[in-house]
Amino acid sequence: MAKRARMTFLTTDEILAVLREAKARSARDHAAILMTYRHGMRASEVCGLRLTHLDMRNGQVEINRCKGSLRTMQPLAEHKGNNRALFDEVRVLKTYLAERTEDGSGYLFLSQKGSALSTTQFCRLFRDIALTAGIAPEKAHPHSLKHSRCTNLIANGVNLMEVRQLVGHKSIGSTVQYIAVSDQQAAQAAKRADAQMF
């Protein structure tokens, strides 16, 4: 049996650093990375988003999941106030859409040449942004955002069935694997607390 690759995830500070760097680069990069994290998407899923998948009036996005052919309708995050502006999907998407040029393909995220952003291009731009933001190379891939989202949801008490739906897992078994990661985070936090106390 093949050994499973170690799951990598970003801390809250690392996610913030990546989003700040993405925002500094472009509205497209900020929107694509934020949506990837918020909805626990794979690179191919975010690159496959079309303008018709967005319902800005009702603040929703339809996501076609790659594995299991699931379709989920999810709310777009809207946060009032500057302290949460990096996570305000509605505001970030409006900014991006205002400057986006139409290519006729209908894809939401476009390359600098105006065609659909490919998975390879998205992975490359995420890696560049993550490395510039100080993220370790082994964490500098878009799938770490999906791992991070699952881990953060579970660590904050969201039940497994809700996490499964939010990130588009077909099987609850795919979601359960994140419990161990959350336990690992808790153990590390306990060690840090003990080090400060003793």
What is each model feature region?
Residues 1-9, 194-198:
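C-terminal secondary-structure termini that scaffold catalytic or DNA-interacting sites
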Residues 2, 12-43, 101-103:
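Basic, Lys/Arg- and aromatic-enriched nucleic-acid-binding interface segment
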Residues 53-56, 139, 158-179:
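Short, polar N-cap/turn motifs at the start of nucleic acid-interacting alpha helices
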